[in-house]
Amino acid sequence: MVKHIILWTLRPELSEEEKQTVKAGIKQGLEGLVGKVPGLIEVKVNISGRLASSNADVMLDSTLESPEALKAYSQHPDHVAVANSKVRPYTVSRTCLDFEI
């Protein structure tokens, strides 16, 4: 199995209300991919509880069946649609950590 962890920082020009709306959209979009993308076992998107010591706004914690499933996930049309509509327009940085478990 593979863990796919992403941290995003939202655009600073977004108001707090806009940030909450964007975070909810990211959570709904990514968590909604379970059952649609083969090999995607679990998705958790953390959008709350951020402490002042944090330097990211949103965290994706996902589990996939294999490295091959991760590659297929990254190219899956439903994932690409969520990334292009709910994530990329509103973020300024992305940090990724993929590892086998």
Model regions and ranges:
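C-terminal structural segments of small proteins and small subunits
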Residues: 67-95
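Short S/T/G/P-rich N-terminal loop/turn motif that feeds into the first structured element of a domain
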Residues: 1-57, 65-75, 98-101
